[in-house]
């Protein structure tokens, strides 16, 4: 646990227009150079695929379209002014009307990154929480092959050779084989909660485990836990 909270924190830190007072007094605020370079400096696309829980491929695809559409609506400011031309604005409207064919859907996030980069003149950060849920539910309900193809195409388009992408962070509970949906991605790095680099970022830290075991009178089970 802690995945969604961390993704929310990343969005709040990087996103243009963020409330910088949220980080006042925190450890990261002591690194002024880092904050000046990154805090509130980038457009951010942030979606959670937790809601793609369906008993059929058609319903799952509809839920995914809804998630993309709602995220695109969050960036409607790009329709203001003249930074985007009429063709760009038509592309944006195709993402928010809900009338999205599968070809539009698999390019939807890449399209949105391109539009955001053009408007802000900044590379775009992409955050995808619970990326594995659609595949887990598809496996349970017998449409895994269809869903893995859709998710692979969506991810490859936005994450691979996308000149508008600054970087992306994905979180999930299951270790989905890299070959299934991340084929050919460059600079792909996998971390688990067992990695020392993040062992104090997710779940409980060591002192918290000891405190809970002591509270329940289970101190002798520390090594097992």
Where are these regions (language model features)?
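Phosphate-binding site recognition
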Residues: 1-225
